[in-house]
């Protein structure tokens, strides 16, 4: 694609949310308890920092996704609401202990850690992330841990250092189809993400590898199908597919609102490729991650799915 070419066709931005994107906000006592538990530890969560539309749902279930290595990112992706910085603070050596204390208070059995990209650090922050995970293993030995990691700028040694911690799920999102990647993701490449996923799958063949994409960014149906095939071909086992929702006017506009029927179709396409697909308008990488983990684990032992309603 040349500099003069537009990465997406020019289309009018949808004026209103369709009915399937309207939901009740389940606020209440449990939500308030989760909010207080997290904020009392001074911990950032991707739920808040990325303005996730599912925050009230997840916090009302006593679940949250912790954001490691700070609350500001060294990349400025066009879809993401996390703050950008060129000079982030050093990693907090007590972060693992703070997360462990919070996870204990919430009674978490499946802990999800995501991270900001730390291109300022030699290993992309892998060592700091490993320290957090090792602390969690010590403090909550029966809990399973899922990590949504950056691409570490393609640093395979950093990836292996992370995988040696025996996490339950390694998650790295391709985010969108290959054609739109330069427009959607800052400093990341589609092929490098596939390379990291494939390397993880080969390094630990029994590891649950996971990735996710957003739709509604201007992608074509054929491109989504190709992305699912690419992920399957590179060793991914679990894929989440959700509707892109614009956090603010300074972010990439929504090109289309994808119907629930289309999500069902994408799920059937992915399942035909052997993938475990969790798809729906509000699905995000870590949305209902505990249930997805249990459903995947049971699928691997040939039992029925326990997934909650995807909407």
From Swiss-Prot:
Gene3D superfamilies: Aldolase class I. Its cofactor is [4Fe-4S] cluster. One of its GO terms (molecular function) is lipoate synthase activity. Binds 2 [4Fe-4S] clusters per subunit. One cluster is coordinated with 3 cysteines and an exchangeable S-adenosyl-L-methionine. [4Fe-4S] cluster 2 binds at residues 73, 77, 80. Residues 59-276 form the Radical SAM core domain. This is Lipoyl synthase. It catalyses: [[Fe-S] cluster scaffold protein carrying a second [4Fe-4S](2+) cluster] + N(6)-octanoyl-L-lysyl-[protein] + 2 oxidized [2Fe-2S]-[ferredoxin] + 2 S-adenosyl-L-methionine + 4 H(+) = [[Fe-S] cluster scaffold protein] + N(6)-[(R)-dihydrolipoyl]-L-lysyl-[protein] + 4 Fe(3+) + 2 hydrogen sulfide + 2 5'-deoxyadenosine + 2 L-methionine + 2 reduced [2Fe-2S]-[ferredoxin]. Keywords: 4Fe-4S, Cytoplasm, Iron, Iron-sulfur, Metal-binding, S-adenosyl-L-methionine, Transferase. CDD domains: Radical_SAM. It comes from the Bacteria. It comes from Chlamydia trachomatis serovar L2 (strain ATCC VR-902B / DSM 19102 / 434/Bu).
